[in-house]
Curated annotation (Swiss-Prot):
Alphabetized InterPro entries for the sequence: Cyt_trans-like, Pantoate_ligase, Pantoate_ligase_C, Rossmann-like_a/b/a_fold
Annotated active site: 37
Family annotation (Pfam families): Pantoate_ligase (PF02569)
Gene expressing this chain: panC
Annotated (R)-pantoate binding sites: 61, 153
Protein name: Pantothenate synthetase
Comment field (misc): The reaction proceeds by a bi uni uni bi ping pong mechanism.
UniProt EC number: 6.3.2.1
Pathway field: Cofactor biosynthesis; (R)-pantothenate biosynthesis; (R)-pantothenate from (R)-pantoate and beta-alanine: step 1/1
Residues the record lists as binding beta-alanine: 61
Source species of the chain: Bacillus anthracis
PANTHER family recorded: CYTIDYLATE KINASE/PANTOATE-BETA-ALANINE LIGASE, PANTOATE--BETA-ALANINE LIGASE
UniProt superkingdom: Bacteria
């Protein structure tokens, strides 16, 4: 595995690889890699001749009161995960390398951002789309892999790639969970012992809702109320949202039909966790 720290070298490598006909699978991350990321890397390894991983904590997607400085970092661990999962190139640029001067251009996302996490994080998805435009141009991927844990991000990226005719295939990958159902996340380390015991109830609330939908319930408000009440009963967390939308358009639905997403965000003392399920309802 080769570690690359400059845009110029990474772009030179990927241009040569693509010119020689090689397919490139790209996994963009902010580091502190866990089994969820490893799953993305293994999928990229299966489907491409070359795998590129980027580790870059992107300041553009953090708001003024968000946890940029607190975001966990451990490049040695990331290198080990990368090597174990068949990465060919680890792109690890500094902030100065990615943003040598103030941006004269950023990507503004105008749809799919005013709900769920995007509603409370104005500018977040503009930061995501801007860094991805840069990373796609640097790594020239055939396919790029994203976890469905952040399903809103996947919906935004799919729209952005289609709108700008970017020649990359977006591959969404299912959420990876702990044995007790908790979605794997770099932020789980901030849960107290007691909160960690309560946290699996987030996924259980979604499973309960899925069962109700499969049993015939079609009223979106009834389902989201059930989820909120379940989480408030079984955890000390505060429900930020429990919402149901058409997917990937993220349009509001009153009656449940077609492909939908049921997504939740719950605040514990030192961390906010998100989870979701998507399902197709006939």
């Amino acid at each position: 595995m080769k570690i690359v720290t400059t845009v110029q070298e990474m772009q030179h490598i990927t241009k040569e690889l693509r010119a020689s006909g090689k397919s490139i699978g790209f996994v963009p991350t902010m580091g502190y890699l866990h089994e969820g990321h490893a799953t993305l890397l293994r999928k990229a390894r299966e489907e491409n001749e070359i795998v590129v991983l980027s580790v870059f904590v992107n300041p553009l997607q953090f708001g003024p009161n968000e946890d940029l400085d607190r975001y966990p970092r451990d490049i040695d661990r990331d290198e080990n995960v990368a090597k174990e999962n068949g990465v060919d190139y680890l792109f690890y640029p500094s902030v100065e390398e990615m943003y040598p001067a103030e941006q004269t251009t950023t990507v503004e996302v105008v749809k799919r951002t005013d709900v769920l996490c995007g509603k409370q994080r104005p500018g977040h998805f503009a930061g995501v789309a801007t860094v991805l435009m840069k990373l796609f141009n640097i790594t020239l991927p055939t396919r790029a892999y994203f976890g469905m844990k952040d399903a809103q991000q996947v919906a935004v990226i799919e729209g952005f790639v289609a709108d700008f005719n970017i020649p990359v295939i977006i591959v969404p990958v299912d959420i990876v969970r702990e044995e007790d159902g908790l979605a794997k996340s770099s932020r789980n380390v901030y849960l107290s012992q007691k909160e960690r015991k309560e946290a699996p109830h987030l996924y259980r609330s979604l499973c309960m809702a899925k069962e109700r939908i499969e049993a015939g319930e079609r009223n979106a408000e009834i389902i989201t109320t059930l989820v909120k009440e379940y989480i408030e009963t079984y955890t000390k967390g505060t429900v930020d949202y429990a919402d149901l939308y058409a997917y990937p358009s993220l349009q509001v639905v009153d009656q449940i039909e077609g492909r939908i997403i049921l997504a939740i965000a719950v605040k514990f003392e030192n961390v906010r966790l998100i989870d979701n399920i998507t399902l197709t309802v006939k």
